[in-house]
Amino acid sequence: MIIFYKNLFKFFALFSLIVGQEFKDIDTKLSNLEFEQVQLPLEQLHSKYPENSDILLRLSITHHYLSESAIEESEDKKNALKAFEYIEQANDIDPDNPNILKWYVITLGKTVEEDTIRNQIEQSKNIQKIALKVIELLPNDEFCYSIMGQWHYKLSLIHI
């Protein structure tokens, strides 16, 4: 799975068109899973380029992994919500970008994990719809299929 993330971040490095060396350094750190070290530089870039979906996507990914690695539950929730806020902004700017949609599904799923059962069920329909669209757009991306597998598993755990 880590190899996939490294390849994903290398993909970002190849297709990014802004901020030259700064962005290259950030992508190198992301590919090395150094999320704490990229948070501040990304936030600085975001303040310069608030409408850049590539920066927002990277901020979302960074906060998602900070959430996943958090020891404190409050840090987990705070970073999960930030990840979702950033990806929502990116989605508003570039709603047809399959990588943004993929991370939208991931961060949405994370934010509803502790929600009410009713909301989990309602959001599971949204998650499935978007995940299927991502699979259609990125049919060779194995991570998309993993997302669907996780969705089915988490849905099976919901107790009414």
For the regions a language model picked out, list residue spans one by one.
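N-terminal leader/linker segments that initiate helical-solenoid repeat arrays
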Residues: 20-68
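"A position-specific structural signal for the A-helix of alpha-solenoid helical repeats
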Residues: 24, 58, 62-65, 103, ...
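Helix-turn-helix repeat elements of alpha-solenoid scaffolds
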Residues: 29-41, 76-85, 121-125
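Specific register positions within alpha-helical solenoid repeats of the TPR/Sel1-like families, i.e.
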Residues: 30, 64, 68-71, 109, ...
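Conserved small/polar residues in nucleotide/adenosyl-binding loops
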Residues: 159-160
